[in-house]
Amino acid sequence: IKMLGGNISSYYQLLKGYNDKSNKKITNKPRIPGYLHKTEGRYVVEFTNQTFAKKRGENNELILCPKDLNIPIPTKIENPKCVKIIPKNGCFFIDVVYEVEQKPLRKTHKYAGIDLGVDNLAAITFSDGTNPLLVKGLKVKYINQGYNRLIAKSQSKLPNNQKTSKHIHRLFRNREMKLQSEFHKITGFLAEYFDEMSLEKVFVGKNDNWKSGISLSKKVNQRFVQIPYNKFISQLKYKCSLRGIEVVEQEESYTSK
């Protein structure tokens, strides 16, 4: 119920921003959260640490609701805050949420700016004159394009009254997992690199049209918008925060200066 209430609150906040003509960030009218499918719809289920068994299982797994459900969750995390079971793309993902101690933010006055793209996933410049760094994005691009073609081909074979299938769900899931794996490798490398350079802040150029595709040609839009840059930024943020480096999102025009 709390999650549903939060979804409705978020909708009205977005709607307020959309109706505010001075707010140029929200360009598409938000849609009110709809009903789930009456037979296939699934909600996210969250288990707080109050539902965990006091003792671990035989293989040191976490036990959810030992008296009623007795669900074993393999995890090395000692003191999880909660566990979420998330239905997505025809399967269930398990998120184990825990708290970690962050390093205090640095005050080195050394900065970096990142512009995100397609062929070059990240173009990075440094305030101290260090040579720019380019992170090639060809593998991410080919994963994205390859799965998009497979999904489009599978969708074209569906009956008129059918919107998706188990095979399409599996393609979406595989695409997302491969992209996420690549992002983890790249953001892990960047966080280590920035740490070695003793950076204080990293500014990431954020384009509010990534999702809506406004002002992008159809060909570029197919390649650019569907790459989940927000997930890349999110991963970079938390990995840098563990090292005392702040990641700030700004409009692309500022990071390029």
Which sequence ranges carry the predicted segments?
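Acidic carboxylate diad motif detector
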Residues: 1-88, 226
